[in-house]
């Protein structure tokens, strides 16, 4: 089961069409739209400002999203966030892709259809224009006018979320203790 925590009177709001994997933690002012998938080990934590995740966005394993007072995190629709990425009090517009291990800091804005490369660090307040590629530490825009980010990632994670909705714990001595062996 995911861990869903009420913090300071705020309970995460999760659309019935969203998928939250076992081991993920959602705490406080977190809002997930339909089709969102939050994968294993993700932490979405919001004590003082809202975390909003738009329709059909996938937050891959071990993603962290957090906010500071007065600095919300707004993730758009059809966004792909790669494994181990950290999004802190930033805005990521629709159809963007955040690479594995990337870090996006407070007040940064990632434009629609932009790509932040794996391991890049987007500084506080930095703007990555729509449809561009940002790479490096600190991130620099290296390429403009990218073709639209392929929708395969989004469609693939929508299908995976549906598959995992129906997953069951393995049972039997060769798989370790399952629900039958607790």
Cite the ranges covered by each PLM segment.
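Glycine-rich hexapeptide-repeat left-handed beta-helix
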Residues: 1-13, 41, 47, 53-55, ...
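N-terminal segments that cap or nucleate solenoid repeat domains
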Residues: 2-38
